[in-house]
Swiss-Prot record:
Subcellular location per the Swiss-Prot or TrEMBL entry: Cytoplasm
Keyword Transit peptide: no
High-level lineage: Bacteria, Bacillati, Actinomycetota, Actinomycetes, Micrococcales
Pfam family, one: IGPD
Record's protein name: Imidazoleglycerol-phosphate dehydratase
Protein EC: 4.2.1.19
SUPFAM superfamilies: Ribosomal protein S5 domain 2-like (SSF54211)
Top-rank EC class of the record's enzyme: lyase
GO process annotations (BP): L-histidine biosynthetic process
Cellular component, GO annotation: cytoplasm
Superkingdom classification of source: Bacteria
Gene designation per UniProt: hisB
Pathway stated in the Swiss-Prot or TrEMBL entry: Amino-acid biosynthesis; L-histidine biosynthesis; L-histidine from 5-phospho-alpha-D-ribose 1-diphosphate: step 6/9
Family, similarity comment: Belongs to the imidazoleglycerol-phosphate dehydratase family.
Signal peptide: none
Length: 208
């Protein structure tokens, strides 16, 4: 595996290339954007979810990924999430002046998802509430429902954030996944926003 290290700037941007025998991934983000996205992962439903993530988090993001999707989408999907987590962590820098916490409850027709984010520096995921069998559904021809948890696991681990994600209602597998991505996006947007009332790092420890 080779990685070109994520490079942060004062503008809260970062870029990273990550290459393994299974995938090649480029991710570039701007936390202070307007939700502009340029996404190509070779997994159309995942492209749709990442585009929604950008739109509702207001993070500008470019993703270019190729991988062994002829075998399974898992490697490419997870490697993109790993790389996104890494650039998110780098773009946040020392986290000075951010709100740190964010929460959102988002519906999509019959589906409803609740997300809470803490940019704590301590990776942790609590993920629940999906209806029985959701993990076995094939969505859009390539994306299995089980990948949703893998995506959030990879992001939280590599970004160093805590995420509680709970599906409160839902029947359609597509809607259940999309509501989660949108809830995460809105919670993340709130958590990484600059708060003019915050001086320094929002932690009694003085570091996150």
């Amino acid at each position: 595996m080779s990685e070109t290290g994520a490079t942060p700037t004062a503008a809260r941007t970062a870029r990273m290339e990550r290459t393994t025998s299974e995938s090649s991934v480029l991710v570039e983000i701007n936390l202070d954007g307007s939700g502009v996205s340029d996404i190509s992962t070779s997994v159309p439903f995942y492209d749709h979810m990442l585009t929604a993530l950008c739109k509702h988090s207001l993070i500008d993001m470019t993703v270019k990924a190729t991988g062994d999707t002829h075998i399974d989408a898992h490697h490419t999907v997870e490697d993109v999430a790993i790389t996104f987590g890494e650039v998110l962590r780098q773009a946040l820098g020392n986290k000075a002046g951010i709100r740190r916490f964010g929460e959102a409850t988002v519906p999509l027709d019959e589906a409803l998802a609740h997300a809470v984010v803490d940019v704590s520096g301590r990776p942790y995921l609590v993920h629940g509430g999906e209806p029985a069998g959701q993990e076995y559904h094939l969505i859009g021809g390539h994306f299995t429902g089980s990948l949703t948890r893998h995506v959030f696991e990879a992001i939280t681990l590599h970004a160093g954030i805590c995420l509680h994600m709970n599906v409160l209602a839902g029947r359609d597998p597509h809607h259940i996944v999309e509501a989660q991505f949108k809830a995460f996006a809105r919670a993340l947007r709130a958590a990484v926003e600059s708060d003019p009332r915050v001086e320094g790092i929002p932690s009694t420890k003085g570091a996150l």
